[in-house]
């Protein structure tokens, strides 16, 4: 019954609807709607098609060469090789005129819009040759520039931020050096402390938790310190080590500064090799980037001493780039067939490189002047297996260590080469003399290490068997062959570390942790022979007054820390630091005083001795007074704590007696104590009476 009633009611409603009037939804005449389409249908209008749809991934390349049809394929090959480095190109159009000659521009479509943006960023203003520099834009830029408003609006004035003094560390009146100590507190979390090496105890300047993920590195002049992070690297400076600049390069593993601190090079891995980016330090702008096939050796770029040029070695060539444009010098590489290595002079725009033996042509060491590309000296070498180039820091000498062989053995396919009867030569180039004469020193024993005296005319070598080697010192003088001045026999050292000021040298065995301090002007006497078990690093301070040896947790996990010595080997500080990883002295910029002024100061140095000694005495007296005050304060604190505990113990006596059966046990054994007086000799003095 209920169902039937419902059906009847439904039918009645249907019949009534046939006679109802339709509602009117039209606006009355003169009605004005105050609601805009954007307010009413904003979500739908955002999805409406636009004129730029489908062309976000298209770039326009202008200023390409205008070539005939015969040369078009070669042009396409060159341009496609450049632009395919930034993504997959799905379509390319080169408009041509009636004669089939290109019009000087092209359209390229990438698979993704982000790839097109990257290509514009990297290749705009790219110099193809002397007459053609690309102008690369997104296709959508035309619409952007068409819609520029006619009324100019002034830019918002940004508040000027006063930057801290980046060179405050060299303004210290007592010229104390600074150093940083890094310790790992967790995985990918390194704490870095900055200290000033004042006497009698170093002073802590700043400590930063989680300052870097791996390690830190100072810039060559000590202005900046660089830290490593997942997104890239950052540089810090100033009195409180504020962030100066950051450089986005994910996965950066290594960085290097240009000598004058104008540029920074970052090395980061890619799926197929490495990406290297050169940055402008002051602006943070990317100047140029390179993609290296395979895992290239770190530090593949070499800078000139004045930051005017940077070079890298290619296959049978050297690529030299000018700054700040970073275009190739004269727009072309220097072709050098068989080149194996090169190095810049530390003081002049001179490149030294060596070429291997080829088809009965001897190996060759060449000095080339840049930017003239003029060869100023050549030296032919025979039976050469390898060469190493060692410049003296002052640029006065170049030593080429030549590994030579008596016999060469090859297999049938020349795939495996063995050198027999090895011996070694040192070719010494006198850079400051006319026509650059070359002297030769032959060593028949295995060479384990080589080191120039930074300021002076001596070099040292470790030669012989690794477990029982000899250390020889040679002196280089004008017009005569380098002479052996001293040989220290049966020394188990592996590395040589000269003082930055010369004269003193540390002979180190970084396997056993033993060190010997030698004065090269006093008959090469060993002044001290300390040891630091498992030490893996040696660091001289910039002034040559202190030496630090360190045991890093990168090598071992126990007994990590560092020791500090004087230049004569006297220990002055031992520091045990858990998870210690790194110790670095802060470099100093070169002095602004002329050589004449420096000579004058050295000549009259005795005049300053009295003032220096008085200042040292006052400092030590002040330090002693501070130490006594500190000890007195500690004693007072302890006595206050002790008296408080004694009073508390006395107040609990009644409770103590009750708990012990009403027996006073505090003085139970006092009567059984025996007192014994013991005398022993402390000091004996003998006085002669006349």
Curated annotation (Swiss-Prot):
One of its GO terms (biological process) is follicle cell of egg chamber development. Keywords: Coiled coil, Cytoplasm, Initiation factor, Protein biosynthesis, Repeat, RNA-binding, WD repeat. Residues 1-11 have a biased composition (Basic and acidic residues). The keyword Repeat applies. It is found in: Cytoplasm. One of its GO terms (molecular function) is translation initiation factor activity. Pfam families: eIF2A (PF08662), RRM_1 (PF00076). It comes from the Eukaryota. InterPro entries: EIF3B, eIF3B_RRM, Nucleotide-bd_a/b_plait_sf, RBD_domain_sf, RRM_dom, TIF_beta_prop-like, WD40/YVTN_repeat-like_dom_sf. CDD domains: RRM_eIF3B (cd12278). WD repeats lie at residues 207-246, 293-331, 334-369, 442-484, 530-575. One of its GO terms (cellular component) is eukaryotic 43S preinitiation complex. Residues 15-25 have a biased composition (Acidic residues). Residues 57-141 form the RRM domain. Residues 1-36 are annotated as: Disordered. Belongs to the eIF-3 subunit B family. Component of the eukaryotic translation initiation factor 3 (eIF-3) complex. The eIF-3 complex interacts with pix. Interacts with mxt. RNA-binding component of the eukaryotic translation initiation factor 3 (eIF-3) complex, which is involved in protein synthesis of a specialized repertoire of mRNAs and, together with other initiation factors, stimulates binding of mRNA and methionyl-tRNAi to the 40S ribosome. The eIF-3 complex specifically targets and initiates translation of a subset of mRNAs involved in cell proliferation. HAMAP family: eIF3b (MF_03001). This is Eukaryotic translation initiation factor 3 subunit B. It comes from Drosophila yakuba (Fruit fly). The lineage of its organism: Eukaryota, Metazoa, Ecdysozoa, Arthropoda, Hexapoda. The gene is eIF3b.
